């Protein structure tokens, strides 16, 4: 495949570029706040984390779409999935707004948008790769954000680095959550092509309940504890202090300082 069609097909939308700009603005405010907890600190980290998470949702869905495009589903281009426009990834409130709200309230990287792909002609291996491409974006972002925090952490700019660490932690939670073999999630999507047809048909109706299954997982104490033990097991490889993550989460939920 030559470079020209690739450049023509992948066109970041102005909305995605705006999300990047807002993320950078939040980071700048958090950087200016230095190591002092003040209103500017809360505003900066909140913008950095929420806009940064929205950007990661776009990259996650773009990963699915771009991989499918490489395997022959060129309909993703006409549907706008290669523009990274968050409004193209299904319903803006339920698919994007709800995960952002959950981030703000609970600090969990909840699955976001979805792209509709034509994969029926693909091999089982290709279908699995398409499913895993989204979580791969979260993995890359987690390594990048936590790696930068580990390498360049400076107490003089603790507010900024706590926001970056928390955003990196959210990528880890999203990675683990998406890889669970629950119908409707990417982990099951990677496994499904290798199941026999009878099993696929039996589990197909459960896909519509994937959201509810995840909610049950997160509100059941024993399952919630198991989930976060797994998340922190992966997170600990980064060498970043969990204190930074906690501080970043508290700054993101700025209202917690008063209520």
Curated annotation (Swiss-Prot):
<keyword id="KW-0482">Metalloprotease</keyword>
<feature type="transmembrane region" description="Helical">
    <location>
        <begin position="159"/>
        <end position="179"/>
    </location>
</feature>
<keyword id="KW-0472">Membrane</keyword>
<feature type="active site">
    <location>
        <position position="61"/>
    </location>
</feature>
<keyword id="KW-0843">Virulence</keyword>
<feature type="transmembrane region" description="Helical">
    <location>
        <begin position="14"/>
        <end position="34"/>
    </location>
</feature>
<keyword id="KW-0812">Transmembrane</keyword>
<keyword id="KW-1003">Cell membrane</keyword>
<keyword id="KW-0645">Protease</keyword>
<feature type="transmembrane region" description="Helical">
    <location>
        <begin position="96"/>
        <end position="116"/>
    </location>
</feature>
<protein>
    <recommendedName>
        <fullName>Putative zinc metalloprotease Rip2</fullName>
        <ecNumber>3.4.24.-</ecNumber>
    </recommendedName>
</protein>
<dbReference type="GO" id="GO:0006508">
    <property type="term" value="P:proteolysis"/>
</dbReference>
<keyword id="KW-0378">Hydrolase</keyword>
<feature type="transmembrane region" description="Helical">
    <location>
        <begin position="203"/>
        <end position="223"/>
    </location>
</feature>
<feature type="transmembrane region" description="Helical">
    <location>
        <begin position="39"/>
        <end position="59"/>
    </location>
</feature>
<keyword id="KW-0479">Metal-binding</keyword>
<feature type="binding site">
    <location>
        <position position="60"/>
    </location>
    <ligand>
        <name>Zn(2+)</name>
    </ligand>
</feature>
<dbReference type="GO" id="GO:0008237">
    <property type="term" value="F:metallopeptidase activity"/>
</dbReference>
<dbReference type="InterPro" id="IPR052348">
    <property type="entry name" value="Metallopeptidase_M50B"/>
</dbReference>
<feature type="binding site">
    <location>
        <position position="64"/>
    </location>
    <ligand>
        <name>Zn(2+)</name>
    </ligand>
</feature>
<dbReference type="InterPro" id="IPR044537">
    <property type="entry name" value="S2P-M50-like"/>
</dbReference>
<keyword id="KW-1133">Transmembrane helix</keyword>
<dbReference type="GO" id="GO:0005886">
    <property type="term" value="C:plasma membrane"/>
</dbReference>
<comment type="similarity">
    <text>Belongs to the peptidase M50B family.</text>
</comment>
<dbReference type="GO" id="GO:0046872">
    <property type="term" value="F:metal ion binding"/>
</dbReference>
<feature type="transmembrane region" description="Helical">
    <location>
        <begin position="129"/>
        <end position="149"/>
    </location>
</feature>
<keyword id="KW-0862">Zinc</keyword>
């Amino acid at each position: 495949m030559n470079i020209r069609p690739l450049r023509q097909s992948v066109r970041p939308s102005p909305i995605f570029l705006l999300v990047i700009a807002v993320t950078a603005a939040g980071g700048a405010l958090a950087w200016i706040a230095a190591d002092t907890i003040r209103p500017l600190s809360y505003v900066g980290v909140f913008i950095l984390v929420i806009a940064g998470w929205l950007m990661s949702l776009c990259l996650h869905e773009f990963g699915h779409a771009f991989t499918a495009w490489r395997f022959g589903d060129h309909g993703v281009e006409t549907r706008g999935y290669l523009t990274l426009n968050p409004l193209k990834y299904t319903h803006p409130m339920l698919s994007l707004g709800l995960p952002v709200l959950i981030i703000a309230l609970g600090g969990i990287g909840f699955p976001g948008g979805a792209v509709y792909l034509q994969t029926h002609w693909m091999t089982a291996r290709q279908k699995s790769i398409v499913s895993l491409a989204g979580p791969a974006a979260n993995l890359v972002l987690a390594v990048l954000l936590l790696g930068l925090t580990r390498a360049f952490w400076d107490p003089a700019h603790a507010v900024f680095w706590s926001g970056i660490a928390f955003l990196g932690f959210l990528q880890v939670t999203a990675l683990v959550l998406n890889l669970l073999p629950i119908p409707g999630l990417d982990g099951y999507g990677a496994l499904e092509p290798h199941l026999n047809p009878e099993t696929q048909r039996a589990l197909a109706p459960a896909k519509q309940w994937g959201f509810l299954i995840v909610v049950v997982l997160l509100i059941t104490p024993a399952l919630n504890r198991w989930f976060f033990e797994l998340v922190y097991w992966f997170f600990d490889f980064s060498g970043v202090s969990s204190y930074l993550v906690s501080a970043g989460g508290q700054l993101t939920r700025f209202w917690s300082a008063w209520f």
